[in-house]
């Protein structure tokens, strides 16, 4: 009985370690209860752009609780394109102050480097505080701007997202 119990514990720990491998270890320092909630691919015009994972602090996604998005890119994308697309989407979702958007562009330029195929960017949203970003497990930016963080994560998680099917899959909702 002891051997079976040990094997079961080892299997559970192995799963936890492999799951956590998609998040930088430091992310758990900020939000120790993060767990993988759902994952889904993003395809544009049939091209596989990235695989997204949503990590949540509780049983489900709650916007006011810490959560992380992990994006494993399937193709190379230049940093300027990542930043420009993010700013364009934040503007589309209601961020209208161009002075603020210019400041946010500078912050995101620190956070979002160019990526190659199979590289990962992780963003951790700490509601009310800001966000932390990693590329390939290396810290790229700590952003102490709660509004920037809220608008950035809205790109994927807001009801008005440009990719509602991805949002539905990440949130584990039933499509309407």
What feature does the model see in each segment?
Residues 1-8:
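Bacterial N-terminal signal peptides that target proteins for export
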Residues 14-20:
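N-terminal signal peptide c-region/cleavage motif recognized by signal peptidases
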Residues 20-176:
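Terminal leader/tail segments of proteins
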């Amino acid at each position: 009985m002891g051997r079976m119990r040990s094997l079961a514990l080892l299997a559970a720990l192995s799963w936890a370690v492999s799951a956590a491998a998609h998040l930088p270890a430091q992310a758990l320092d900020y939000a120790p209860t993060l767990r993988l909630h759902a994952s889904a691919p993003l395809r544009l015009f049939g091209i596989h752009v990235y695989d997204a994972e949503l990590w949540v602090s509780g049983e489900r996604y709650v916007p006011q609780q810490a959560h992380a998005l992990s994006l494993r890119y399937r193709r190379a994308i230049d940093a300027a394109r990542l930043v420009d697309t993010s700013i364009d989407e934040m503007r589309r979702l209601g961020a209208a102050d161009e002075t603020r958007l210019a400041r946010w562009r500078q912050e995101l330029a620190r956070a979002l480097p160019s990526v190659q195929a199979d590289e990962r960017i992780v963003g951790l949203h700490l509601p009310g505080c800001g966000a932390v970003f990693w590329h390939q497990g290396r810290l790229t930016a700590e952003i102490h701007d709660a509004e920037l963080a809220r608008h950035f994560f809205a790109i994927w998680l807001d009801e008005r997202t440009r990719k509602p099917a991805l949002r539905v899959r990440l949130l584990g909702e039933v499509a309407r």
